[in-house]
A protein has these predicted regions:
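Thiamine diphosphate
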Residues: 1-93
Length: 93
């Protein structure tokens, strides 16, 4: 079994799901060009484009709201919140 960090496991898992299912997309702060604060989405925007790897404003409640709404319509969003503490503002969604 390969030994890897969480980030090393998450990145290829997201890529594999995005290749397998066109309904999967990623949204969050700096997930596109910068590849996320920890690099979890590095290279995904180059591979899948800006429509499937979306940089969002600094608004966790908006990220959660968009993800919830997209899921209600059959899409498969991956909402990236930079830090666990930042999820609390999203709970009102």
């Amino acid at each position: 079994m390969a030994v890897m960090t969480y980030i090393q496991a998450i990145t290829p898992a997201m890529r594999d799901e995005m290749e397998r299912d066109e309904r999967v997309f990623v949204l969050g702060e700096d997930v596109g060009v910068k590849g996320g604060v920890f690099g979890a989405t590095k290279g995904l925007q180059e591979r899948f484009g800006e429509l499937r790897v979306l940089d969002t404003p600094l608004a966790e409640s908006a990220i959660a709201g968009v993800a919830i709404g997209a899921a209600m319509y059959g899409l498969r969003p991956i909402a990236e919140m930079q830090y666990s503490d930042f999820m609390f503002p999203a709970t009102n969604q």
